[in-house]
Amino acid sequence: MKTALTIAGSDSSGGAGIQADMKTMTANGVYAMSAVTALTAQNTTGVTDILESTPHFLGEPLDAIFTDIFPDAVKIGMVSSADLIVVIAEKLKQYKAENIVVDPVMVATSGAKLLRDDAVEALCRELLPLAAVLTPNIPEAEILSGMTITDATGMEAAAKYISEKYGCAVLCKGGHKVNDADDLLWRNGFGKWFHGKRIDNPNTHGTGCTLSSAIASNLAKGYDLDESVERAKEYISGALAAMLDLGHGSGPMNHMFALKGAFTE
């Protein structure tokens, strides 16, 4: 069985973060492991508190994982401090990790920045050059490129700039401000659009975590990047179309929509 590791924050409501990542990885047929960057107290209406991991206690589980069940792919989500970013980069290089998917969680749904400037600098300096693919949304792509994105042409310019600057593929997600379901993959000097059907579901908590984890899962299984993105988009469309309705705010998707059998009844 192929394996995947998520390095991200914990969401107490289970809709995003490592909980969404591990459900997604399991649903996509790989064995899921985790290293926690932060504990959060949150639900579908918002985040009330965050307790960040220490650099030492992030490094320890990474050592434990890489020296025992080596991951075939790694997904990196929310990492809020420069010190933690440095530890992650050191461990990934030490163990020669492959198929690294970076979801640069930098901007909250409200538009507020989630990373301090030194953490953004560390992310760009330490992690982005290690990535096989980076999955920014529009606000994150604007921060990384220094550009304002208002249309598909702007997405292409920003993705090209980021890809060339950091030497990685970039999947620029069009759900913010530009369109709802079309994403752009830029790599090796060329762009490819992945068109998706808009699903009218207000419960979208954890979509970014889910997409990046699904991509990592498919890379772990040996699919190339184009196939991994295509399969990940199909999976997230199914999770949204299942129309799970939980909580009083923007609720989670049904990550296990395809799960059937005696134990689900």
Where are these regions (language model features)?
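Conserved N-terminal subdomain of the carbohydrate kinase-like
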Residues: 3-6, 26-109
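Short pre-catalytic strand/loop immediately N-terminal to key active-site residues, enriched for Gly-Thr
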Residues: 7-13, 191-205
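N-terminal basic/disordered segments at the start of proteins
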Residues: 14-30
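Short, small-residue alpha-helix embedded
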Residues: 19-22, 142-143, 201-225
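Phosphate-handling active-site elements
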Residues: 29-33, 192, 218-232
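Charged C-terminal helix
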Residues: 52, 226-265
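Conserved phosphate/ATP/ADP-binding segment of small-molecule kinases
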Residues: 117-191
